[in-house]
Amino acid sequence: MVRIAVFDSGLGSLSIINAIQKICKSEIIYFADQKNFPYGKKSKKQLDTIIKQTIKLLEENFSPDVIVMASNTPSLMVNTNRKVIGVHPPIREAMMFSKTKNIAILGTRAVIKSKSLSSYIKKFNFSKDKKVHKINSSILVELVESNKFITDKIYCKKIIKKTLDDVFSDKIDVAILSSTHLSFLRSLLSSEFPQVKFVDPADIVARNVLASIKQNKSKKNTIKIFTSGNAKLFGKNRNRLGIRNKVSFLST
């Protein structure tokens, strides 16, 4: 069976896992590194240490065929080995979808303010009539990690509107969900801003995973869940998402 390790600092990995298991039967090792939540508030130096230690931990404990770093923040800011698949904003695809040639990237503060994202955008060498707006959406990520997107949707809609109302009045018609947590808010975002197309990179990551696997004889999907934080509390949060798998503690 193909074994795929997927990690993030919280619940965000689940959106990536769902996309992977739709197209690739596999055993998923899901590690929620809650001890280091949120990645989006860590410095580049801190992230470099955390990510490299986490990759080593997963390799030594589980020997995965593929490791997925299911977070935009370290994917953009930390250099890893070829075995690791990251999550990057699908900027070229988003620009192709846009009629106004004005797109937005919604991400954590660390990503939005990073030189790494600016350098990544420059690689596309867009003409001056094409605009990429970077939007700090850390407060929206918190809505997911706190489970408010399940328990208090009215509050979430207020925060979404307050955060993005002015942004989306500026010709933006396509927005990239550049945090795996934001996938869980996609329906709420679309209901508040129906004129905006929200692009989720999860499907692209899943296709990259499938392409990296040379041979797959797996016939069913399984998932084992670990956390570096409070396993009991994380289990409750996971239950609210309809996932009943046992959560085990994994020391980092």
Q: Can you say where each PLM-predicted feature lies in the sequence?
A:
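Non-catalytic structural scaffold of enzyme domains
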Residues: 1-252
